[in-house]
Amino acid sequence: MTYTGKSIKRLNDDKFITGRSNYIDDIKIPSLYAGFVRSPYPHAIIKRIDATDALKVNGIVAVFSGKDINPMLKGGVGVLSAYVNPSLFRFKERKAFPEDNKVKYVGEPVAIVIGQDKYAVRDAIDRVNVEYEQLKPVIKMEDAEKDEVIVHDELKTNVSYKIPFKAGDIEKAFSQADKVVKVEAINERLIPNPMEPRGILSVYDGNSLSVWYSTQVPHFARSEFARIFGIPETKIRVAMPDVGGAFGSKVHIMAEELAVIASSILLRRPVRWTATRSEEMLASEARSNVFTGEVAVKKDGTVLGIKGKLLLDLGAYLTLTAGIQPTIIPVMIPGPYKVRDLEIESTAVYTTTPPITMYRGASRPEATYIIERIMSTVADELGLDDVTIRERNLIDQLPYTNPFGLRYDTGDYIRVFKDGVAKLEYNELRKWAQQERSKGHRVGVGLAFYLEICSFGPWEYGEIKVDNKGNVLVITGTTPHGQGTETAIAQIVADALQIPIEKIRVVWGDTDIVEGSFGTYGSRSLTIGGSAALKVAERVLDKMKRAAASYFNADVQEIRYENEEFSVKNDPSKKASWDEIASLATTKEPIVEKIYYENDVTFPYGVHVAVVEVDDLGMARVVEYRAYDDIGKVINPALAEAQIHGGGVQGVGQALYEKAIINENGQLSVTYADYYVPTAVEAPRFISYFADKSHPSNYPTGTKGVGEAALIVGPAAIIRAIEDAVGARFTKTPTPPEEIYKAIMSKK
């Protein structure tokens, strides 16, 4: 049986649907519980912390603050240098508590309370008395850029990063323009909402440190813990149990995790902490940027040049991946289009708000929203339709190096765009919408095209072990946490070894078992991790063939292998099963192969269409979402389609509902009463296809990545659909009902 290309059911779902999963809170190790005293102010000096009353609470073991924990740390959390050049940013590594005794956002931890049960800890938190001297906050990016209120005194400015991205001759492009079109694209601050909040359990025995951690990057976490705490990596184990979602937010190491580990070291006792939903919403936020610019165009819709300013909010601290936004968004703004002349000033600033982290798409949604806003706005200004403007500007030959040096790999953008428009029946939907509007029904259809960068390297680890019964253990450096990647990897290995998938087990996420790992994020897992597994499977099969040759006393070139059976080409009577050769081979030496597989990034792309209804009060609802994607070779169509559906629902959230509301006093609403996340009720009907003539990547798997596609392009398609329904221009995600209502009323 061939497994690749088939919708094989996920291999590990039984434990999740029967309640046998094992999350951080399920780990049965007797431990102390931690909780945090947090700042009620966005900007203030800590004058005094008095834990006297808290320590009187029955069951409370300790209360630690910065003076107790920060001196233990050899460093703090910095930036992910694999993708971000730290020298380009002004920043200070973040320790467990503010080193300057100055809080910089509402909810910043100022002390950790340790107790025998979580309820005592919650009581004690309220009895820690903290005296503050309030300072003036700076909430808006535009105000922070003025440097009138400085967030980090030692940096002497709020501007962490300011780089002009220039390509071609922008002045020449604008001098040749028939028209200059102004464009604005706003991505509001939003909050990743995995079902399981962050959690950690730290055990220190005086010699070694064991950490169970809800993370996407266990090996990176181990390296950082070793650096920060001065403990050799060989003495640290980081284990990733089942993780209830992440969406990029669990790539980060936050201050709370450092405090929990430090407390377990100080007390020589296990300490655990799981964030409440409010704490999760305070700690993990994303997006928050504004693009304002001008576009030079010809009358026929040809885009000659783009210039503008990208202003990004970092929040109070530069987190591990926040630096990706100001560096990747500008270079991805050209997208799949031929524009060669650009000048984008990218500026990232600190504000007294919760730090910005990573969220599904991580810079690609912003870049896509900007370039698709440009295309749609130019189309409106020139009286062109959305199909014509894109066809006129799409890259027509690949591979292609974009103006900032990114090499787009394989594909046919124009053909896939045309095929997608036809397959998704976009033109037919437009006619239907016009007919419905003539009847008084406010409906709209929006289209957007995307190109994303995926499969970030620089490498991924793969290892395979074959036991004496022929069973195969695949050890992957990827870290699945809901995507089903382990099933797809098993499919790849089963086909490579020509054995039943039931003989394969895939493991990940434990630094004591997995030699190396970069983790799961950026739609990289199946492409680079699956390719590592495929290459190492080929090595294993070669070793098994050599074992068979030895058994048959034949040359290895004479060995034929097919459907679990080894035989000699010129003597078919000599044959043995996979299991038999495995049994013989492992008596002498184990069958083990490993690889650190390296390759370059990939660029999947596609066209998505949204259909919306808008009522008289401005409430928009996405009723149908259609997708046509070229993601290279599709290993498991059901898993790939599930990623489109999940990303599409999150795209609905970003386009219509999700905005972290921070008032002028820095107070953030941290409940679902104020932060709306789409549920199954708001989910649209999905129709999704993968390109009839796909273009495989240069990876052994031929895959490109699909995990973020729909959230990358969805907001642009949905906002365009609202514009079609209402007949007005909108610039931001989310576009709230009150703005839609104002536009409706202005038409009357």
Curated annotation (Swiss-Prot):
It catalyses: D-glyceraldehyde + A + H2O = (R)-glycerate + AH2 + H(+). One of its GO terms (cellular component) is cytoplasm. It is found in: Cytoplasm. InterPro entries: Ald_Oxase/Xan_DH_a/b, Ald_Oxase/Xan_DH_a/b_sf, Ald_Oxase/xanthine_DH-like, AldOxase/xan_DH_MoCoBD1, AldOxase/xan_DH_MoCoBD2, AldOxase/xan_DH_Mopterin-bd_sf, Glyceraldehyde_dh-related. Keywords: Cytoplasm, Metal-binding, Molybdenum, Oxidoreductase. Its EC number is 1.2.99.8. Binds 1 Mo-molybdopterin guanine dinucleotide (Mo-MGD) cofactor per subunit. Mo-molybdopterin guanine dinucleotide binds at residues 247, 360, 522. One of its GO terms (molecular function) is molybdopterin cofactor binding. Its cofactor is Mo-molybdopterin guanine dinucleotide. It holds the Pfam family MoCoBD_2. Optimum pH is 6.7. At pH 6.7, glyceraldehyde is the predominant substrate, however at pH 7.5 the dehydrogenase exhibits activity preferentially towards the aliphatic aldehydes such as formaldehyde, acetaldehyde and propionaldehyde. Component of the glyceraldehyde dehydrogenase which is involved the nonphosphorylated Entner-Doudoroff pathway. Catalyzes the oxidation of D-glyceraldehyde to yield glycerate. When the artificial electron acceptor 2,6-dichlorophenol-indophenol (Cl2Ind) is used, the enzyme shows a broad substrate range (glyceraldehyde-3-phosphate, formaldehyde, acetaldehyde, propionaldehyde and isobutyraldehyde), but is most active with D-glyceraldehyde. It is not known which acceptor is utilized in vivo. Belongs to the xanthine dehydrogenase family. PANTHER family: ALDEHYDE OXIDASE 1-RELATED, XANTHINE DEHYDROGENASE. Heterotrimer composed of a large chain (CutA), a medium chain (CutB) and a small chain (CutC). This is Glyceraldehyde dehydrogenase large chain. The lineage of its organism: Archaea, Thermoproteota, Thermoprotei, Sulfolobales, Sulfolobaceae. The gene is cutA.
